[in-house]
């Protein structure tokens, strides 16, 4: 920690990462999602921020003028909800604050004040960011409740309103039933986005009232042969518009937020309902009401139709209850028949509800994608035959749409909304429901014009990893209206309706633009009242007259123009870093809002999305008590070890697994490099032989590889080269020079290690600074240039030559492992050079899909011995590895010369002094029944 603290102070004192426009340098503007300061950072937070910082440091070394700013997100309910929990004495939360985050009691008592909490955790998070080594320009820091930022958000929302992208409407939203506010991802525990989906209710008449069965598959109603209810749950008989309906008591409470005038008349037990029957409104058939424990009273209405031909649960439980009910098929799947659910249940023999859930997903997926409707006209009421005849032979998706329209238009049912990923809990602890919100302000992400702009933007964005692009395209397709304001929480009031506060996922979409001039607002001590709509209109879009704006605002015109210039220097944003959980909300809104407000040349250029962090293979959670505070982890292992551990043992889009053993292995690796630098002065050798040529080639090829990996943000491959492959190259170099009985070349090692420290710097900046100064440098390696790509130092022939030596070594060691006597000497018989040409031709023939006869036609064997050898060479060409293929196809060489270069190495590694290289023609065929093939010499041990 002493090393890291030393260099952090050095960076801060020298303002190393403050970014100022420089017309002579290419700019690189990167941001990471600003955090909610409602608790300290833990290891899971660290990955996204360190990933972004590694890339920022790399681009800085590549010669870019890098801007990497940071701010804090106070908006919305997360902070208020957390403060409320503290005020209520939430034992679990307070215990976590005490035992995991080690927050003093006297501080916890003050966390009941939302602003105290936000400011306290802001400083805690900021310190963690500094301790982990983030190269941030802190001059640009702000919070989202700063009045200056609020003026910017007011401008943004007026622009969106002008363009018709903000509407007042009625729409389903996630809703907290206690605080009576819309709920989005950042308002929920675990940051779960409430996913709202549609159920279709179909009205089955009964003498108890209408049973509104809830289904996602209305096209199967023709095959409904029963109605399920849960006999152990309470059911409400409710009145809606003068009619009686029966639904679970829990559903009636939930649906009261969607259905006006829903009035509970009485409550009965589900067991009372099973004494009755109901009538299918489409077929007119009377069906029994059956009790089933698997019916969830909180899903839909707690009333479900039973379609055993197409629902594994239904078939399984009907069979279990020995109900003698016929199965009615309505969907056919080519090659799989008309009773898919029944067939799969009987075939797979499910043991529990989890097995049934998997089968259900399988049946639904297959029938949706491949199913067509059979002739259902013989099943329906006579008066519906003509209207429903067009469903016959329709694919399931089209049939679902048509039957839904038929049901709703005929008054035979209606739609309701459900939280599809329930249970989702508001931060206050209550389960989120769906509410049909009236007269609410929405961002109209369903607007087709806006969707088209977003799609156009997506086409110009570089996505890392590339496959994440399709997820954004999917979001644009399904995204609809989203409530953009709340009546509770911190933030900016809606400018035209100030009882509403703009919510957290709506004021965090273009704030990256605010960074570009945030420090100038402070520098010139501008008042919020000066930051008018016209001011932002000019700074962000260049609209208006700066002289007029200066007169009205009192801001000097040169200051206004300078801020406009600085904005244009940094914008557009080059890359946005975030976790994959923000793809369906924040990151997509980020694309939409930029596309709506800015011209296309200022749209985002890149988005990098990373996976999560596991701890010992498990998700970090309160229940598992495996949350590790980031600052504590830094103290335990050091910042650079944490940086490497969080970013290098998985591809960027996959989850990283952090473990104590992995962190300690990184410590050992870094210590080995430190020890190597300590020993550098002991190496007095000056030879420039084969070992030195090989090491230079491997190292400079590594520089090329690392640069390519870093360009694509492949941190795993980069770090593998820098930390592990390089270590193996150094160790192998030492083996090579030992085999020659001499000292390593200290000068070469110093040159190489100097470059290697630069490669390491983005990943382990504190350790790299320490090593940099240890080798006598007095600059900051963080500000050094990235190594120049120099192909001239890469010698593929030297590299492949040693690969050949190692391959031969492995072959000899394999023979020695089964050799019973003590080996005294080795004879290596090398194939005649002419056979190398045969192998080259064989490789060419194999690559083109040719046959052995073509090789025979080219080289025309002189006898059976040649023909047999050619056949073996052809087989070798089919199996040869890539390295040996490169060697034989790219270079003209004598295999004996190749071996001569590795003779000392082989002797040293095998511990056998007498190794002779001979021509295959010198082999005594009567004594040794072996063939020497090109690159596969015959090995005789004596």
Curated annotation (Swiss-Prot):
Kindly state which reaction or reactions the protein catalyses.
tRNA(Leu) + L-leucine + ATP = L-leucyl-tRNA(Leu) + AMP + diphosphate
* Entry EC no(s): 6.1.1.4
Q: Give the subcellular location.
A: Cytoplasm
Give the signal sequence positions.
Answer: none
Q: Where is this motif: 'KMSKS' region?
A: 619-623
Q: At the top level of its lineage, which domain of life is listed?
A: Archaea
The UniProt keyword set, sorted, is: Aminoacyl-tRNA synthetase, ATP-binding, Cytoplasm, Ligase, Nucleotide-binding, Protein biosynthesis
Gene Ontology CC, one term: cytoplasm
Q: Name one GO biological process term.
A: leucyl-tRNA aminoacylation
What stretch or stretches form a coiled coil here? none
Which positions does the motif 'HIGH' region occupy? 35-45
A GO term for molecular function: aminoacyl-tRNA deacylase activity
Q: What InterPro entries does UniProt report for this protein, alphabetically?
A: aa-tRNA-synth_Ia (IPR002300), Leu-tRNA-lgase_arc (IPR020791), Leu-tRNA-synth_Ia_arc/euk (IPR004493), M/V/L/I-tRNA-synth_anticd-bd (IPR013155), Rossmann-like_a/b/a_fold (IPR014729), tRNAsynth_Ia_anticodon-bd (IPR009080), Val/Leu/Ile-tRNA-synth_edit (IPR009008)
Q: Which Pfam families match?
A: Anticodon_1, tRNA-synt_1
User: Where on this chain does ATP bind?
Assistant: 622
Catalytic class of the enzyme: ligase
Predominant localisation class: cytoplasm
Family to which this protein belongs: Belongs to the class-I aminoacyl-tRNA synthetase family.
Q: What is this protein called?
A: Leucine--tRNA ligase 2
Gene label:
leuS2
